[in-house]
Amino acid sequence: MHCSSPKMVCETKIVADEHDAIHGTKKESILWSSPPSSAPLNPAEAKDVRKDVVFIREFERGDQEEVRRIFYEGIMERIPNTAFRGLWQQPKTQFLYALLTIMCFYMTKSVMLTCCAPLILMGARYYYSRKVIQNYLDCALHTDMADIDAYYMKPTGSCFWVAVLDGRVVGIVAAQGHEDENTVELRRMSVDSRYRGKGIAKALGRRVLEYAMRNNYAGVVLGTTAVKLAAHKLYESLGFRRTGQSEDYRLPGMSRSPLERLFFQIRHTRYRLQLREE
């Protein structure tokens, strides 16, 4: 039987312009022997803490608004990334769009319309990316992100943490236990865009791995639709290994209409970090 870990605060020192402040590289495959938990700081001690120190603590009800803001902004960033940058991951779609552009020329014999065709296609991609991702966001904000306490803090094997810098919540991450597979799923990781590049995401990821180790799970899994290479490098630096990939992933809220399939594609990648042999 797994049990939730006691409330604790993990202190991580973050230096302002240091891009890898948290120790751990690709060479460090498994290094998740957890340090002893430290007691929460009292107000007198908190005054002496430097402003470049990040604290990762468990979610509290008063964090709800900031947590939802960080999650919302992080998901909304994926609209242009999916619409435009994501196209480079879809060679078949590139070929199809090129074919449609050529067909436009042969059917209209208009150079102007042919030159406008790629712009129309990109506009349609942005429209459908926004539509699908907003539907997904609406679904999330009305399920687990609507009541974090009920979804993550109360169930056994799950937890939610926030990263706090200078009294402000700047990052979030969740762990959801799957008893049937003896794994923990890393979910909802996001860092405020103003505080990225300081090692906060890596510290949040390590917190989930420590939690899994303390509760005797065999592994940690995650699935991501992130387009940016930096996100995938982060997971690999934590020790995760890619286990699968889908080019035809269906997000919650998708209708799968012909136009949506034509103008919205997203790659879903699965990762796993094996903590111990079962």
Roles of regions detected by a PLM:
Residues M1-V53:
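Cytosolic, low-complexity regulatory segments enriched in Ser/Pro/Gly with interspersed Lys/Arg
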Residues F59, M189-V191, T224:
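Hydrophobic adenine-recognition pocket in adenosine-nucleotide-binding enzymes
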Residues T12, I75-P80, R85-A98, I102-R187, ...:
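Acetyl-CoA-dependent GNAT
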Residues F55-E66, T93-Q94:
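A short beta-loop-alpha structural element at the N-terminal edge
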Residues R188-S193, G197-R214, K233-S237:
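Conserved acetyl-CoA-binding loop-helix of GNAT-fold acetyltransferases
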Residues A212-T224:
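Conserved GNAT acetyl-CoA-binding A-motif
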Residues R68-F71, I75:
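Hydrophobic alpha-helical core bundles mediating ligand binding, dimerization, or RNAP-core interactions
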Residues V9-C10, L41, Y128, D138-D144, ...:
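Conserved catalytic-core motifs of GNAT/GCN5-like acyltransferases
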